[in-house]
């Protein structure tokens, strides 16, 4: 990573204008998984959503949700 | 001339608490500069009101001393003065409110998309920072813990209760989004010279947008009681030039991936 790292991250989302971004992180995670369900696991279009939720959500939350998805107990509209 | 500049303009700005400090730390972000300016605006009116009230008080005590003025007057109304003492304070309140609301709403405006997201996660009793903009999978984000350096291990020139082993490295003059949360009990992520204090609530992600305008090292402390070592979980933000940011982050990445 010698050259300039491109500085890009999840953009500000007008659906979540306030300080509390919990729902923003959750929504991006769900959008990614709905995108992969609709377009297939290998689709590159969904990578955008993946970057967004990884930027916003703490790693522990993502791990917990992944486990919940695997065990079928994920509390969200996937 | 240049020597003079060198002597006087390289005095380091106040970015950490100083002993017997009276005023704010030096501003490193537009928000903090706005807060300091608002403070100066309000302080002006404060002095005006203080001098006026003290003058009236001293004058009343002096002229209406019982020895000099034995008979008290019984005045219960005075329409003019009542109108004036209602109008003037409301005008002064308006002069205070205008810059105050302007600052309050501009602090929440996110005009420019942030370039970086950094997650600050509070634990008992240390901080974890995650820089996850560069992952290609769910693992691998740059994550590190930040513990206070205990007093025995401090080197000469370091500040007691303020230094940490791993600082949060950020690029200067770049819009940052900091997401603050906690993994156990409420904490608060505060850096006074950046004008930031944001509660770290478990189960909630609080977002703050800052733009650090100058390079430097900024210190802060946990601002929400979180157990025995609440006083021993400081925060240190190091703003580096944008072009050095990449190499600093990857230097931190290398030892980390060795452990992770």
From Swiss-Prot, chain A:
Keywords: Disulfide bond, Mitochondrion. SUPFAM superfamilies: Cytochrome c oxidase subunit h. A motif (Cx10C motif) lies at residues 46-57. Specifically expressed in roots. Its main location: mitochondrion. Disulfide bonds join 25-57, 35-46. Residues 22-65 form the CHCH domain. A motif (Cx9C motif) lies at residues 25-35. InterPro entries: COX6B-like, CX6/COA6-like_sf, Cyt_c_oxidase_su6B. It is found in: Mitochondrion. PANTHER family: CYTOCHROME C OXIDASE SUBUNIT 12, MITOCHONDRIAL, CYTOCHROME C OXIDASE SUBUNIT 6B. This protein is one of the nuclear-coded polypeptide chains of cytochrome c oxidase, the terminal oxidase in mitochondrial electron transport. This protein may be one of the heme-binding subunits of the oxidase. Belongs to the cytochrome c oxidase subunit 6B (TC 3.D.4.8) family. This is Cytochrome c oxidase subunit 6b-2. It comes from Arabidopsis thaliana (Mouse-ear cress).
